[in-house]
Amino acid sequence: MGVEKQVISSGNGQDFPKPGDRITMHYTGTLTNGKKFDSSVDRGSPFVCTIGVGQLIRGWDEGVPKMSLGEKAKLTITPDYGYGPRGFPGLIPPNSTLLFDVELLAINDKKA
């Protein structure tokens, strides 16, 4: 249970986000059946947020800090670290495992 990270391409191996850092990333989220439910790539605009302060699903708050600047990874997030029994009406069914392809583009003002 939780979040599992599979590295697609390595980052710099030195800079990792800490709670409270502002991160910039691209992501594509899919269900285990392959259905895409969200993508910053498709919108053409990276996602900017604060990591580790409870603004995001737990799987991101715990998975993204394991990535170094510039890294591309696949995060597999179990329902208890995602949207749980509520799901996200219209997009994510209850108790869904989520798959995210994530690229960490920046931590605060430091870019990959």
From Swiss-Prot:
It is an enzyme of class 5 (isomerase). It comes from Schizosaccharomyces pombe (strain 972 / ATCC 24843) (Fission yeast). GO terms for biological process: conjugation with cellular fusion. This is Peptidyl-prolyl cis-trans isomerase. It catalyses: [protein]-peptidylproline (omega=180) = [protein]-peptidylproline (omega=0). Gene3D superfamilies: 3.10.50.40. Binds to the immunosuppressant drug FK506. Keywords: Cytoplasm, Isomerase, Nucleus, Rotamase. Pfam families: FKBP_C. Its EC number is 5.2.1.8. It is found in: Cytoplasm; Nucleus. InterPro entries: FKBP-type_PPIase, PPIase_dom_sf, PPIase_FKBP_dom. GO terms for molecular function: peptidyl-prolyl cis-trans isomerase activity. GO terms for cellular component: cytoplasm; cytosol; nucleus. Residues 20-108 form the PPIase FKBP-type domain. Residues 1-22 are annotated as: Disordered. Belongs to the FKBP-type PPIase family. FKBP1 subfamily.
